[in-house]
Amino acid sequence: MKLLRGIFKAVISLALLLVMLTAGVYIFVRAKYGIDLWNTVGQLKAISKSVDESEVCPDAFVAGDYTSMQTVVNASVDGLVGGDEEAGFTISFDTLPSEMTSIISLTDKQVGALADVVIKKYVNSKITIAGKDIAIVLKQIKFDTDENGVTAFNTVVRLDMTPFKQEMNKFPLKYLKKYVPQYMYVSSTVNVTKGTTAFSYHIEHNALAINKLSADKTEDLFKTLDKVLKIGDAETLNKKIGNIVIGSLVGSESQTGLAYSLKPIGATDYAFTKVGGVNNFVINK
């Protein structure tokens, strides 16, 4: 009987010690880093669950959208988009025909296919976050233009988080590392407003969501991670994704994009249009 009581007391003491140590770690991390460990672990657990792509990007562009995009673009600019579904698609603005023969009008899925081809060629499918080059894969693009001409532009991308996980070996990140998935699906929505001059635009933050987290919880998680990883807030990443994708479509002197690159052969501007409930990205001549 005395032996059982001794074992019971030892177990209780050990349990209390573990509780005190855990509470101590929580209080220390909260005080030193401003991180709520329990809340952060809960959020990371939510995004660490396996992701069904059909749920996070139900309207993803597919192989046929590359082919139809190629047909539309090449009907105006002969030979601009090369390749096929088997070999993959390519694009180059180095050698252009003498003239853009007609306007180019693309649906959201065709826009997704075009942006993917341009980003692979001219951005090397990378996005820089906290000084690290992160592999980015476009999965879905949808946009809608309101009566005021503001376009809510949504992009779903997959980010490879390996470079960050490799550096999460020190306290307190080592406690969070196992909950960070290798891939994060990021839904980026920005508001795009056309500028007053040709080929110009302005991008504003709308919403950012990771995997199945809400936009609010995503912003809260980014605030936490920024304190130790210095990755910036959700708005910063959102605008970065938006600028890469919109830049691949419109372009400028500093970023290679379709519309601006066709200026020497007759392109006059771009537009996001909505006619009969159908949204299109248009390059005018």
Q: Would you name each region that the model predicts?
A:
Residues 2-285:
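Extracellular/lumenal and peripheral-membrane lipid-interaction modules
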